[in-house]
Curated annotation (Swiss-Prot):
InterPro entries: Cellulose_Degrad_GH3 (IPR051915), Fn3-like (IPR026891), Glyco_hydro_3_C (IPR002772), Glyco_hydro_3_C_sf (IPR036881), Glyco_hydro_3_N (IPR001764), Glyco_hydro_3_N_sf (IPR036962), Glycoside_hydrolase_SF (IPR017853), Ig-like_fold (IPR013783). It catalyses: Hydrolysis of terminal, non-reducing beta-D-glucosyl residues with release of beta-D-glucose. The active site is at residue 314. This is Beta-glucosidase BoGH3B.
Amino acid sequence: MKNIKKMVLVSAFAGTCLTPHAQTASPVIPTDPAIETHIREWLQKMTLEQKIGQMCEITIDVVSDLETSRKKGFCLSEAMLDTVIGKYKVGSLLNVPLGVAQKKEKWAEAIKQIQEKSMKEIGIPCIYGVDQIHGTTYTLDGTMFPQGINMGATFNRELTRRGAKISAYETKAGCIPWTFAPVVDLGRDPRWARMWENYGEDCYVNAEMGVSAVKGFQGEDPNRIGEYNVAACMKHYMGYGVPVSGKDRTPSSISRSDMREKHFAPFLAAVRQGALSVMVNSGVDNGLPFHANRELLTEWLKEDLNWDGLIVTDWADINNLCTRDHIAATKKEAVKIVINAGIDMSMVPYEVSFCDYLKELVEEGEVSMERIDDAVARVLRLKYRLGLFDHPYWDIKKYDKFGSKEFAAVALQAAEESEVLLKNDGNILPIAKGKKILLTGPNANSMRCLNGGWSYSWQGHVADEYAQAYHTIYEALCEKYGKENIIYEPGVTYASYKNDNWWEENKPETEKPVAAAAQADIIITCIGENSYCETPGNLTDLTLSENQRNLVKALAATGKPIVLVLNQGRPRIINDIVPLAKAVVNIMLPSNYGGDALANLLAGDANFSGKMPFTYPRLINALATYDYKPCENMGQMGGNYNYDSVMDIQWPFGFGLSYTNYKYSNLKVNKPTFNADDELIFTVDVTNTGKVAGKESVLLFSKDLVASSTPDNIRLRNFEKVSLEPGETKTVTLKLKGSDLAFVGYDGKWRLEKGDFKIKCGDQWMDIVCDQTKVWNTPNKNTLHK
């Protein structure tokens, strides 16, 4: 029975991949006739081996001379280039050599060598990809930006676009044309080890920031990526951020409506913006690995949207169908499943056996030449759009702004706008100059902690070595307040980076900062997490470490006021120490300029404007998102079944304080009664009633009062960030289409139903009414991204 079951599963994948799916949309990226002509010419003359090679991606270490590289610095192996490119015609390489960032000159030298080999052996350029996910993370001396979760906290689309544009420029300075970014997974489970890579828990924020990043990376024309731009790769398609266990790469159980309405939304928006590639979720949903899901890969993405971009696997995920997920008996069978499901390129990353397996499958009739040609066309199209056939590499002398002060200023602004003030009792902040400050905690003097993963290395563990030109929190406070006014006693420290256990802490020395407190006017305690990335970041307890919490409790006993600084990639449970602090600042992972940004904010030289991009839980069994269902937050029910359900959170989504105050008034709309085709134009007056200038993120929410499927508590629909001088009032305009208030019903169809809605902006509420029900018969609403 087991074998019969497997045969049915595989034949379903193989058979349906050849079934035509009706196109319901014009090409989401305009077709370039010249590029398509070139592709047809190549497909006619390429051998099967050459075609399959284009579908294969190998990590750089395979073609490196590792022994020499470890002694003298990174260099390639001509013998392995002969095998990988000469024999197997491999069309893509990825990753960072020796596991650490390289100088742009070293990148350019290596990629020139690779491209010369590829053009000589195949006549087709190689495409090289790296994970530059928060700035130029793998190019030394480049500009690092805050991690995605911080950029979400800025609620600043333009800042996200500028950051991606700078990252593209500096990535291209090393002749790298492809970045595996942005990350638009929804960070809806605080336990998840990759929560910090995306823009937060909300699908609209991820969609807006993802679109902004694509604009910055790729420029305006997806068919002609300029010399200062790169191809974006949206990841991880999709639903990666909600594993049932909370652990990375473990199964999810996502409803069809949530998949379409929320998890698909950022990818839909980015593809409509012209995103050229997508990387697939490594996990399993409702029993089926995403890499094997033809419906999601081919139908939803390629056919329904008429998208001609490239789908690439994540690391070793074809083999995982055999070795981990057990839906394939052999690795060869796994190749068959994923290629027929719609994968175009395999991030193998070590074995060229993928090429051998796929050739055999084609010769056996298990994978059609039609599917091969479609995949290869997508690879070639990406290379033509990048201009690689004309310029396989670039003159790095053109990139004279690399690592410039101009770029650094943008990164500093991003860090300042991303750090969130959560508590400020008695206006203890800002801290006046001349105060004696006791600085404590394991995160107070660490570039590794400020940066997080994907920073100079996968786990970010070498950041203290590679980021010495930048300021830790301690160094930044010394610069701001004078070293003579900073007393540094960490009390708790992390184990050496040579220890594989990122969470491990040394024996605490709490007595030292407690003794030093007598000399201080105020205590700043920097707590949180050490750096980690992906599965190594899995944990079993979301509560902050006992050592760190005990440090705060001991310091509180001194009677000196405490400012807690939370430097972490996910919200660790701290409910027992929050009441002990006068102020709390959540800086998350602000990267190389995060220490300077914090010093500016604590001193009042900059004003807080960040807002929470996720819901911060108070208890481990009270994990929730802001768009929860009504039954998750109920008062006590009387009778025999006497129970209640409470949303017990520490800080809500969208929350953030400032050194000034904002008053909202005059919320209005042009059409209080509307239908799906109407444009709704909301206006609201926002006044800075305080004494200092500030920036305010104006968030517009909707609440569907009654629907045929249980509606969410509330949903974010638009946002704008405005700058206001003291006493200044601005009228903020926020536009929606009536169809933006639609939802996906139990039947999987988009629907907007007659009935009442409430709109919220700041403390302002208003009522609007939909007077006409509409049900879409297309998979996606036919409304382009705003």
